[in-house]
Amino acid sequence: MTIGGAERLLQGVRQELATMESRNHFVELVAEGSAPRERLAALACAELLVVPSDRRSFAFLAARFPEAPAGELFLSLAQREGVALSHLGAFVRALGLDASTISSYEPRAGCQAYAAYVAWLALNGSRSQVAVALLANLDAWGSFCAAVAAGLRRHYGLDDDAVGFFGFFASPPPGFLELGLAVVQSGLDAGEAPEASRRAARLLQHYELAFWDTLAEGLTGEGSPEPHASGSAM
């Protein structure tokens, strides 16, 4: 089996997404030290919901598609989310968030849309849909995490342990691209529609940007924040 078709599909999707990507105002604010600490708390609380959801979604995908290479990819992603959750705990502690603050956090729709769509894909998507969407989103997510980690160190006094969650996601695990392409190709070989994968990638990228845009609402003069509980993190 060759992966030429998968590579061409992913390349085309990445080129399309590059034309739609907009500035990430929240990451820019963190990078320059202008994001309020309460918005960092909102980021942590949002991820405390997103990461376990993604972990369950990937575990479900591994059960839906147990045969290699898909089963291997999705199981490894579920395990990786488990590691990420432990790193996230260090970020939460560095911000001084206690159990009461976390439990009173009111989730924002824009911050949970990404995880909700990943869960939808886990239930309804094909293996190539999921793999293309994740591979295409990888560059943006990784670059955002790298910039946040650097900004947190430089401007907020957080050490490597505290920013480990973002450093963990700043680069893909070894072999992830190759394994992902193999999953895409196996789906294409089985007759899965390339356009469905393109559509999934576009939607996931929109939801990725919506996550960060929601965190930046009211800080950049663009948009208006959604209602949330008084005194709680966004």
Where are these predicted regions, by residue range?
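Small-residue-biased structural context
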Residues: 23-28, 34-38, 97, 150, ...
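Acidic, low-complexity proline/glycine-rich segments
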Residues: 1-27, 105, 109, 174-178
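Transmembrane alpha-helical segments of integral membrane proteins
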Residues: 177-186
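Acidic, carboxylate-rich catalytic segments that either coordinate divalent cations
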Residues: 192-234
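Secondary-structure edge/capping motif, primarily at the C-terminal ends of alpha-helices
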Residues: 61-65, 152, 156, 187, ...
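Active-site-proximal alpha-helical scaffolds that flank and shape metal-associated catalytic sites
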Residues: 8, 69-171, 206
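Alpha-helical bundle segments that constitute or directly flank the non-heme di-iron/ferroxidase center
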Residues: 12-21, 27-64, 124, 129-146, ...
